[in-house]
């Protein structure tokens, strides 16, 4: 609800309207291609929505998921069928892959499923090249994987290199130098064809400070949370935890990490059975290598360019190998299924017993005051998961005891059981997730999904709005500019700006009400407060606003609406400047309190030293005696900026246009994130864009009336 649906709508409408350059609806503004290539632009499923009207997009999410799961089953089959004797066995493996714990866990992130779909094709093309020297297919699949999602492509490259060289070392494959160079050429050509999306994506992502946080020290050798090891182990034996509500290991700090690898019905029985065979098969070694990589932090992070953030978003590739091991075990008469079922049952029961019955002692002043049993956070859900795993183990045992006599009967019975388990555990997972979120019929369906059509405010498209403790990205879905945004990929200048005033900005922009000067600087005119929750912007009686200068305007569309009396229109001028060094000397503030830097931005534009020299004579340096800031002076600064603000402002497909009246040559500031690709014209003449106020842009406008800026 908070990312995928709004992103689909923004990108869909941008493509249909030709607004492919700059998205003013994403945070404070963002490069459209760079910000949405990770989520949507490379996905063929997104492009299928383009012919449909914008109002239908939320209703297409379900059909698109059906198509994605079907496609993952198909591509899984394309890879697996080479290794099986029977098409039905390959079909079993493809269903295991498509409905693995990783796929179900990541229903929340529906853009992850494109990687799940296309990756088997790249391995299948590599297999075809190595077996039959069929050329061209590998280049096409490399292009597809890179084009669809560059982030997952990094992990796919790591995996494919391990897969390729391990099979060479195991003598499963042989290749001449000439054929190797031709294969490498295909890989290069595939990446080259994907550069149309890859280059703008890289240019955007490299601005994000999160990409430069490399794993190091002891954190590269051992996980700093010991519960994470158990979380990794249990994800192979149990259905996946909810992304936001880890249950088995509540303190593993693995929320949203995509820790899911359970194979429906079979779990680890087929994998353990295959690993117990005394044969030197490449797949056996591959699985051991992958399990080791999952347990060693720096090896795990090699699937994401050694980034220090913990994610297991490469496990779909591991589940493909696990599905392959399972189907190969099904066709190998030497596999001791009784032994593998016993091992799986023992490990599953051990994990359940430790987490479900381990006592916790509570002491006060050295005296025992309480004893609780169980380490899980949600006992009912935990024991349901245990029951699902145990029932599946029992079902596998039943299939081998009573259905093994006829291969055809066994395969049909297995497919029926596998399909039932896949459907019901998926429904259970989704249903549990819905119980952890708001009741959609109270607010989301009647008010959020209507696009704000019942709200009639005159300038929603030319100013910014704020949403107080409301559903993330509501403004995106309504398609109005806002300072609130749950979006990971935004210009580096946005992150630099928020960092300079102490507001955290990692995956979302959510400045708290303590930062009221920020609202004026970024031209926030309206605030929407959900009237269906207990988080009141001004208390239940609506008489104590959380920020100064806000007045109640009315109620519409399930929201109390507040108006900012300190609103400054987009595009305004200054009389003073503050050097970056002097700005840095002011107090920064933090997440819950505003420092002096924020109100200082309303009194003086912040300039770098080279910009000060270039704009010499245009502005005066802010005097020392004017560097004290109060709530009263804040209101006066807003009034001063409002006196010399643009008389009109409108967004266009290429950026924005504005009009201003100036009494002299002035620097006009816009709270639009600076990017190197911007160009500007004033009265039709090209002008330089200045990078000011820690990441925003400004242009010099001459004296005159109705000065045009675009």
At which residue positions do the language-model features occur?
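Membrane-interface coil-to-helix junctions
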Residues: 1-73, 95-116, 205-210, 218-262, ...
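Periplasmic/ER-lumenal interhelical loops and adjacent helix-loop junctions
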Residues: 2-11, 44, 179-180, 187-277, ...
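Membrane-embedded helix bundles of polyisoprenyl
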Residues: 66-82, 87-169, 182-202, 207, ...
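Transmembrane alpha-helical segments
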Residues: 72-79, 118-130, 158-166, 267-272, ...
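Contiguous transmembrane helix-bundle modules in multi-pass membrane proteins
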Residues: 133, 152, 282-449, 703-710
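Membrane-interface helix-loop-helix junctions at transmembrane boundaries of multi-pass membrane enzymes
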Residues: 172-181, 270-294, 406
């Amino acid at each position: 609800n908070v990312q995928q649906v709004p992103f689909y709508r923004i990108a869909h409408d941008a493509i249909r309207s030709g607004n492919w350059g700059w998205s003013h609806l994403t945070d404070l503004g963002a490069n459209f291609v760079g910000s949405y290539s990770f989520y949507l632009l490379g996905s063929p499923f997104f492009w299928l929505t383009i012919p449909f009207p914008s109002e239908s997009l939320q209703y297409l999410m379900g059909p698109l998921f059906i198509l994605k799961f079907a496609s993952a089953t198909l591509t899984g089959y394309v890879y697996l069928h080479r290794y099986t004797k029977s098409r039905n066995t390959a079909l079993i493996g493809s269903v295991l892959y498509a409905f693995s714990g990783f796929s179900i866990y990541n229903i929340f992130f529906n853009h992850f499923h494109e990687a799940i779909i296309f990756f088997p094709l790249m391995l299948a093309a590599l297999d075809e090249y190595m077996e039959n020297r069929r050329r061209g297919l590998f280049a096409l699949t490399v292009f597809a994987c890179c084009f669809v999602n560059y982030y997952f492509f990094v992990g796919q490259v790591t995996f494919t290199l391990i897969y390729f060289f391990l099979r060479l070392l195991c003598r499963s494959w042989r290749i001449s130098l000439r054929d190797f160079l031709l294969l490498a050429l295909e890989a290069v050509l595939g990446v080259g064809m994907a550069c149309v999306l890859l280059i703008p994506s890289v240019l955007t992502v490299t601005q994000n400070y999160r990409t430069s946080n490399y794993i190091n020290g002891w954190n590269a050798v051992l996980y700093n949370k010991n519960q994470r090891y158990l979380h990794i182990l249990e994800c192979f034996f149990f259905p996946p935890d909810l992304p936001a509500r880890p249950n088995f290991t509540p303190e593993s700090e693995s929320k949203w990490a995509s820790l899911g690898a359970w194979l429906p019905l079979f779990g680890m029985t087929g994998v353990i059975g295959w690993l117990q065979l005394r044969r030197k098969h490449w797949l056996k070694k591959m699985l051991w290598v992958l399990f080791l990589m999952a347990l060693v932090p720096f090896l795990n992070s090699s699937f994401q360019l050694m980034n220090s953030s913990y994610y297991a978003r490469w496990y779909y590739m591991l589940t493909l190998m696990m599905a392959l091991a399972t189907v190969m075990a099904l066709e190998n008469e030497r596999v001791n299924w009784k032994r593998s079922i016993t091992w799986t049952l023992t490990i599953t029961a051990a994990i359940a017993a430790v987490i479900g019955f381990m006592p916790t002692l509570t002491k006060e002043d050295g005296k025992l005051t309480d004893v609780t049993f169980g380490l899980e956070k949600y006992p009912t859900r935990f024991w349901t998961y245990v029951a699902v795993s145990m029932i599946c183990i029992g079902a596998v045992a039943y299939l081998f005891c009573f259905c093994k006599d006829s291969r055809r009967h066994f395969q049909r019975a297995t497919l029926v059981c596998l399909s039932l388990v896949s459907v019901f555990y998926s429904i259970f997972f989704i249903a549990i997730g819905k119980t952890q979120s708001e009741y959609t019929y109270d607010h989301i369906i009647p008010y959020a999904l209507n696009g704000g059509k019942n709200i009639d405010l005159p300038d929603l498209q030319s100013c910014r709005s704020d949403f107080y403790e409301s559903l993330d990205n509501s403004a995106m879905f309504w398609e109005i500019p806002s300072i609130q945004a749950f979006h990971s990929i935004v210009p580096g200048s946005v992150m630099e700006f928020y960092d300079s005033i102490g507001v955290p900005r990692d995956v979302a922009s959510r400045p708290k009400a303590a930062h009221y000067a920020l609202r004026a600087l970024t031209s926030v005119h309206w605030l929407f407060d959900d009237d269906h929750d207990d988080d009141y912007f001004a208390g239940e009686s609506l008489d104590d606003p959380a920020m100064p200068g806000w007045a109640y305007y009315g109620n519409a569309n399930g929201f109390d609406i507040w108006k900012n009396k300190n609103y400054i229109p987009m595009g305004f001028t200054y009389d003073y400047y503050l050097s970056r060094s002097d700005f840095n000397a002011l107090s920064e503030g933090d997440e819950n309190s505003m420092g002096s830097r924020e109100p200082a931005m309303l009194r003086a534009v912040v300039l770098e030293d080279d910009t000060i020299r270039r704009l010499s004579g245009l502005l005066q340096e802010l005097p020392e005696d004017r560097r004290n800031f109060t709530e009263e002076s804040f209101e006066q600064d807003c009034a001063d900026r409002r006196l010399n603000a643009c008389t009109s402002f409108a967004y266009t497909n290429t950026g924005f246009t504005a009009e201003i009246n100036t009494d002299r040559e002035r620097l006009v500031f816009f709270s639009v994130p600076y990017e190197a690709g911007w160009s500007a014209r004033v009265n039709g003449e090209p002008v330089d864009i200045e990078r000011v106020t820690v990441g925003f842009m400004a242009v010099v406008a001459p004296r005159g009336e109705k000065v045009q800026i675009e």
